[in-house]
Amino acid sequence: LYPVRFPWLNSTQETAVNKVLCTRDVAIVHGPPGTGKTTTLVEAIYETLHREPQVLVCAQSNTAVDWISEKLVDRGVPVLRIGNPTRVNDKMLSFTYERRFESHPAYPELWGIRKSIRETGSRMRKGSYSEREGMRSRMSRLRDRATELEIQINTDLFDSARVIAST
């Protein structure tokens, strides 16, 4: 099975990819700028995905995470980019957790429920005691449903991502 040949990589990169593929849980690739770490990591991640259902990719900078993520997306790998969207490059914005969460099919229902919770809370402050009791029950049901939807959306997002990328 090993070593795997990658004719498009130089010998150092090929050795690094094979070492990553031989590790059990965690692999760290480091080195000076311009030495091919991104290319090496993308290949190692891509090959790992033939053996594992999901890979967590972490790097010290958002730029590095975005470079790796972009190259994986270009290869058709489903990536979920975690992190502050203001620090993510434009090409990767549609792959951020926040954007994917808001574009999930269940999000409109969740948004509507959150709106109802706000409106009900506002009415509760103005209502009589008996009205507030009924509204409390409604709020409880709304919150329970919102939690169910949030869990569903998160499960879908994380289960469908082959790569989860973050700083």
Language-model regions, residue ranges each:
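Conserved P-loop NTPase motor core of helicases/translocases
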Residues: 1-2, 46, 54, 58, ...
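N-terminal pre-P-loop "Q-motif" helix
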Residues: 6-25, 39-40, 166
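Pre-Walker A (Motif I) flank of P-loop NTPase domains
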Residues: 23-29, 52-54
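P-loop (Walker A) phosphate-binding loop of NTP-binding proteins
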Residues: 32, 60
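Conserved glycine(s) of the Walker
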Residues: 36
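Conserved ATPase "switch" residues in P-loop NTPase domains
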Residues: 49
